[in-house]
Amino acid sequence: KVVDLGSNSLHAENDKKEYVYKVSDYDYNLTKNYHDKGIHRYEINEAVLLADVVINIPKPKTHRLAGITGAMKNFVGITYEKASLPHRAIGDKESGTGDAYDKKSILKMYMEYIDNRQTICSVKGQIVMAKLLDFLKKSLYILGVLFSGDKYRIGSWYGNDTIWRTVVDLNHIVRYANKEGNICDLPQREILNIGDMIICGEKEGPVGPSPKP
């Protein structure tokens, strides 16, 4: 079910900046259908909306975009359409066009464009072209680092101002969206968070974390 937070979304604070949001391995035009000026929609699993109680069992670990995955970040799993989850804003922090990387760089700007073209080719099954674009993308990234000294990309750094807003939006939906997906003033269900912290994850999370007892 689609839940539209509209002006209640924390992303609405950046509407005037006209960000273009991106999710890795998804065409940014898909995400634009969910998040644009005045529109902030999320595809939410109806089972969550129909529940009276939600039991949330996260595995705490580091996260290269969000910093940490815990009880709040774990609610990213309530959506069945990842394209509706903004992870970064295309562009650089320095000029205010986005938060995917820090310093302004024409090379990285082209890298972002090629990254999206690669995604489209992969979806269409154009594997050879996708591999060529991947090589070109990585080459531009290396050149971008050499010229700007900025090693960051795809929002994977401490200056990411997008993913935390997505996380808070989803937590707001879990707490206040009723069974029809409408946002109410009062909480609509109870939430129990139980962290599985026997072994956590540190360093290169969330994909390749090191065990932390």
Feature annotation, model-predicted:
Residues 1-213:
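Extended, low-polarity segments enriched in aliphatic/aromatic residues
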